[in-house]
Amino acid sequence: MSTDPPQNTPQRQSYSTGTPWEKAVCYSRAVRVGSQVFVSGTTASDEQGQTVAAGDAYQQAVYALKKIEFALSQVGARLCDVVRTRLFVTDISRWDEVGRAHAEFFEGINPAATMVEVSRLVNPDHLVEIEVDAVVGNW
């Protein structure tokens, strides 16, 4: 394993929020390499790692998507650059709540999307976790 962390260069940019999860697991919220952007699984956790909107799948999805939108902006991307989303939910019967939030952010963009039920997320109060991939620029 390399002990030297990758540096931000014209070809690679990383953005971290500094949340406890990112520090504990050593990952970035978003990484851009060239025109590709990858946003890590994002939940409704605030800066201190506390769950936002416990019990409300819709509000958790909205909060996560706002965090994703900001993370994208930090590496020079926008929601309209998103080409794929992955939504992990702990109760698929609440798909419509999460789907409604997704639609509010991605109407007209219509990225490829997958929603799957998982048995649980790292924090049991989290009901949804969202990842996105984006491509920036003219292609």
What are these regions (language model features)?
Residues 1-66, 70-83, 89-139:
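N-terminal presequence-like segments and the immediate start of the first folded domain
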